[in-house]
């Protein structure tokens, strides 16, 4: 099959099937991946086919990760989510055969390569670093959850615009900090992510299994789900000249409605296709209920709902303002269509798709609430953000050895770069690591 030139992926031998779907969702991405990956209805790691059916309920990280990845290639996800060597040894007994077809993904995870070298050094470093910042992360998360409810009640009770804005920011930050938790084994903190009308289970697919593994590529749901309103791929076949400039106008509207769109899309898809809703999609309703009860029921249900919707809209805008200007969109970093570096190591690919927020590193609170330390988070997503600063020495050492470069900027610079990327349609001909 001949692939049209503009559909050729820099990290795979085929164009992802899910991008042909009329409505792009986590379910359509999973369905397409099962068609594309050559996993033969089971689980694929490198060139082996594994049957983890009997292991689903035994998985220490929870059954979700195994159940939802059945029928797909989990090579990179398996590597990034397991820091110890025990899982690699354990899976041998679940192998049933070699794969019939070669992998479609062209990124590598070779012994002695960048990622495996860094991973070994990080494994050693973790034996001696201070673990107390992890407890601080837990306290920050708990404090934000409590404050969003208290401020939400105060905003309604005293009709305070200031309290409303503060409650909205607290909701936004709660959602972002909760993202620190859904990459890991099941825990109560991950449920707080749903307070913003999004869903941690859906984001475990769209964010952890799609965006984290294939950032800024055709396989990245966090690119495709915003199209055509916002399009960062430098490709005129995907973004028209009109949409390049209209996106600057639609952007603030998309920001304010993003949380509602996520919920609405899941409801629509569940009614028309396959159910992708969970019981914990009801958790956002605890906010207007808390406001109603906290004001003694004196304000009426409609006022409480109105206050909640206003909180959610402001939080949605804030979330997008932070999240879409946090790490991934700038003309200087790799997007699908740009030239690839010669070394196809998956870890280096992660570094090439990220520009970190250098202005956040002095504060654990800001790192947690603004997607900071992003390169290390992509490379080791199961580690608490509070532990990441201690890993910079080995990261810099390994980057130097493999000709990698950690890019940094502040928030304003990133916002400017992100808008330049929305306009860019010409691929970057110079590969990362190629020198001047």
From Swiss-Prot:
Pfam families (UniProt xref): Cyt-b5, FA_desaturase
UniProt GO molecular function: acyl-CoA (8-3)-desaturase activity; heme binding; metal ion binding
Biological processes per GO annotation: lipid metabolic process
Keyword entries, A-Z: Heme, Iron, Metal-binding
Top-level lineage group: Eukaryota
GO cellular component, one term: mitochondrion
Residue ranges annotated for the Cytochrome b5 heme-binding domain, each copy included: 16-100
PROSITE patterns associated with the record: CYTOCHROME_B5_1, CYTOCHROME_B5_2
Binding site for heme: 59, 82
Keyword RNA-binding recorded: no
Expression (tissue specificity): Muscle.
Role: May play a role in muscle cell metabolism.
Protein's name in the database: Cytochrome b5-related protein
Species whose genome carries this gene: Drosophila melanogaster
């Amino acid at each position: 099959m001949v692939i049209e030139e503009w559909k050729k992926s820099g990290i795979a031998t085929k164009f992802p099937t899910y991008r042909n779907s009329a409505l792009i969702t986590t379910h359509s991405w999973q369905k397409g991946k099962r068609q594309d990956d050559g996993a033969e209805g089971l689980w694929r790691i490198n060139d082996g086919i594994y049957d983890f059916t009997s292991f689903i309920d035994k998985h220490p990280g929870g059954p979700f990760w195994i159940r939802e990845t059945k029928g797909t290639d989990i090579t990179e996800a398996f590597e990034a989510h397991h820091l110890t060597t025990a899982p690699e040894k354990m899976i041998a007994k679940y192998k049933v055969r070699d794969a019939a077809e070669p992998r479609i993904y062209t990124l590598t995870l070779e012994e002695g390569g960048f990622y495996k070298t860094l991973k070994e050094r990080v494994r050693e470093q973790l034996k001696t670093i201070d673990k107390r910042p992890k407890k601080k992360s837990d306290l920050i998360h708990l404090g934000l959850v409590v404050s969003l409810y208290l401020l939400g009640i105060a905003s309604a009770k005293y009709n305070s615009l200031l309290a409303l804005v503060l409650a909205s920011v607290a909701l936004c930050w709660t959602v972002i900090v909760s993202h620190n938790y859904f990459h890991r084994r099941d825990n109560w903190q991950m449920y707080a992510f749903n307070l913003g009308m999004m869903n941690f289970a859906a984001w475990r697919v769209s964010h952890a299994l799609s965006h984290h593994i294939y950032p800024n590529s055709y396989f990245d749901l966090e690119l495709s789900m915003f199209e055509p309103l916002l399009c960062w791929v430098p490709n005129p076949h995907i973004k028209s000249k009109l949409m390049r400039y209209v996106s600057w106008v639609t952007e603030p509207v998309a920001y304010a409605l993003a949380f509602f769109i996520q919920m609405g899309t899941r409801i629509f898809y569940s009614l028309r296709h396959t159910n992708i809703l969970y019981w914990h999609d009801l958790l956002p309703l605890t906010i207007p209920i808390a406001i109603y009860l906290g004001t003694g029921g004196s304000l009426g249900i409609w006022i409480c709902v109105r206050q909640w919707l206003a909180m959610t809209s402001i939080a949605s805008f804030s979330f997008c303002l932070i999240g879409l200007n946090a790490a991934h969109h700038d003309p200087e970093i790799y997007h699908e269509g740009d030239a690839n570096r010669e070394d196809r190591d998956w870890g280096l690919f992660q570094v090439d798709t990220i520009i970190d927020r250098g202005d956040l590193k002095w504060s654990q609170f800001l790192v947690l609430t603004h997607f900071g330390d992003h390169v290390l988070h992509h490379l080791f997503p199961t580690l608490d953000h509070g532990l990441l600063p201690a890993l910079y020495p080995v990261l810099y050492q390994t980057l130097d050895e493999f000709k990698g470069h950690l890019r940094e900027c502040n928030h304003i610079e990133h916002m400017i770069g992100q808008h330049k990327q929305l306009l860019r349609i010409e691929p970057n001909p110079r590969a990362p690591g190629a020198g001047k």
